Amino acid sequence: GKLITYVIAYFRMNNMIGKLIINGNFQKILVFLFPLALYFNTLNNSFVLDDNIVIKKNEYVTRGVSGIPDILKYDTFKGFLKSENSATAVTGGRYRPLTLIFFAFVYEFVGENAFIFHLLNILFFSLLCLSIYLLLARLLKSKFPDYANPISFLATLLFATHPIHTEVVANVKGLDEIFSLWFSVLAFLCILKSIDDNKK
């Protein structure tokens, strides 16, 4: 009797879990929370490698909001290298003002609190993963309506867990790469929405 009760409970639980996993809203929540759990261990990291160049030792970022005009005017490394030829001190130019402006705003409010910088990096990576899920589901829905969500869910989890992203998420400076892909995915989603709206 007890064995049958356990077996029935097991299958009911599996059925409930199965229904949750194929539920699109639940998948969205998981896709957002999974990277947070995956990279939670980076929250206690300090600034490392290029984080010092773009945040901690960058004169323009450490000025906070008042450094934004110089961030917009000069190469990314200028605030760190403090020389007129900063663009040539390192091979190739590095004009990436968006992330430095974001860092300046964060620095204005929390200073050198690496925990907050790492937390924001993980949150933006989670938003990127959610956006990738939405894009894949939208692209697959017309050809594979029954499988679009599960395929998108698994593909996004694979993307989130791939070790190649560790450097981007664990180093705060990697936010420029997260932003690049995230804004590209958002642009693609907007294009698809515009196409759908024009069909109506």
Task: Locate each region found by the language model.
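Cationic, low-complexity basic patches in intrinsically disordered or flexible, solvent-exposed regions
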Residues: 3
